[in-house]
Design a protein with these regions (language model features):
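Mobile beta-alpha loop/short-helix "lid" or hinge segments that flank ligand
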Residues: 66-67, 71-72, 165-167, 181-184
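Conserved amphipathic alpha-helical segments that form helical-bundle/coiled-coil interaction surfaces
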Residues: 92, 98, 113-174, 188-196, ...
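Short helix-capping and inter-helix turn/linker motifs at the boundaries of alpha-helical repeat units
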Residues: 18, 116-117, 181-184
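Short amphipathic alpha-helical interaction/hinge segments
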Residues: 169-173, 177-180, 217-224
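Short linear motifs at protein or domain termini
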Residues: 1-109, 114-115, 151, 217-229
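Electropositive phosphate-/nucleotide-binding environments in soluble metabolic enzymes
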Residues: 17, 21, 187, 203
Length: 229
């Protein structure tokens, strides 16, 4: 696995952000877009060489990723992107469905025209990516769309909980979007969600958000199926 980081990464270091934090964010991005996949080994020496830094901040970044559940350390072997079991994945889907339903209900009561415009812009961009079959473009937009809904809901604790679940779900969520035609179907569901939010229909928005997540679960495991590892 090529663990090359963004060549301009070192140039974007801010005084208020440590190198360790920057490396961690970049590694999270690589996992999010599938550049680093479940089971891949993170070569600390290679990453340090790419950045022109010592192994220290790279090692610290990996420790942070371990705490967030994205990687795990195998003694005398190294750091690996964590592989999620089917049962863990199903449990995360169930949690995410409940959290998103709440986000939809909360946001519907307070959504602004500016927020609706922003969500519709993302839907249009995802539609363009789906038309071109560009999963690597669609997926980050998809992530931002869902994050925006939770953020717009205005509930800080909900945002924190969703962020934690999202991080782990990056390890397998792309699998459903890889399925033929799934990007178009998923984005049609996005458009319906925005329609419900704009109309301030809280119950409908909550139901659509929950269904949207559970449909992805069903694609992986079958209707109400018990996943087998």
């Amino acid at each position: 696995m090529d663990t090359t980081l963004d060549p301009g990464l070192g140039l974007r270091i801010r005084r208020t952000e440590s190198l360790t934090s920057l490396i961690r964010r970049e590694l999270e991005r690589m996992i999010e877009v599938g550049e680093l996949k479940a089971g891949d080994r993170l070569n600390e020496n290679a990453l340090a060489a790419k950045l022109g830094v010592s192994r220290g901040p790279v090692r610290e970044a990996c420790r942070g990723l371990e705490q967030s559940g994205l990687v795990h350390v195998i003694v005398n072997r190294g750091v690996f992107v964590r592989e999620i079991s089917n049962r863990e994945a199903a449990e995360l889907y169930d949690i995410r469905a409940a959290l998103y339903a709440l986000a939809g209900r909360l946001l519907a009561s307070k959504i602004t025209k500016k927020q609706v415009t922003e969500l519709r812009r993302m839907v249009r961009e995802m539609e363009e990516a789906a038309d071109k079959g560009e999963l690597n473009v669609f997926y980050p937009l998809n992530v931002r769309f869902h994050e925006a809904i939770v953020q717009f809901s205005g509930n800080g604790r909900l945002l924190s909980m969703c962020t934690s679940v999202h991080r782990e779900m990056h390890l397998f969520r792309r699998r459903t979007l890889d399925m033929p035609g799934r990007m178009k179907i998923s984005n049609a569901e996005h458009a319906s969600i925005v329609d419900a939010l704009e109309a301030k229909h809280g119950d409908r928005a909550a139901r659509l958000m929950e269904d949207h997540v559970l449909k992805s679960r069903e694609l992986l495991f079958g209707p109400l199926g018990t996943p087998a590892d």
